[in-house]
A protein has these predicted regions:
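Cys-based phosphatases of the PTP/DUSP/CDC25 superfamily and their flanking regulatory architecture
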Residues: 1-132
């Protein structure tokens, strides 16, 4: 599988040695700038459509991604909106062994809102299970 090595996106990858595959990654629709005024460099996000029990890659049912960084938080929500994602499952703690593993991209309290991309995100149900 061909990785996205030629794109200058190092600041968008949580792990420099784990890249998205070109043929299955969502490509963010280009925009002149983000709502916060920052320019959009390219359509890259470290995520891939994956096979799942509901269908093949062609059906675009499941997206796997790295936990968003603080600087990719808006790109993450941009992908969610663009791809009409209806459920998000996070399988890591925000921090593990003192290191950030995922920027908190949702409001920490159910019912609260957090501005994201071109919308306000509201937490409906937050369930935390211990990770061993």
């Amino acid at each position: 599988m061909e990785e996205t090595k030629e794109i200058k996106i190092h600041s968008k990858d949580r792990y420099s040695d784990i890249k998205a595959y070109k043929h299955t990654r969502p490509i963010l629709v280009p925009r002149a700038s983000m709502p916060d005024g920052h320019p959009v460099a390219n359509g890259y996000i470290n995520a891939n459509f994956v096979d799942g029990p509901l269908g093949q890659i062609g059906d675009r049912k499941i997206i796997a991604s790295q936990g968003p960084l603080e600087n990719t938080f808006q790109d993450f929500w941009r992908m969610i909106a663009q791809e009409n994602v209806t459920l998000i499952v996070t399988t890591c703690n925000l921090t593990e062994k003192g290191r950030s593993k995922c920027h908190q991209f949702w409001p920490p309290v159910e019912g609260n809102q957090k501005p994201a991309w071109e919308a306000a995100i509201q937490s409906v149900n937050i369930s935390v299970e211990p990770i061993d």
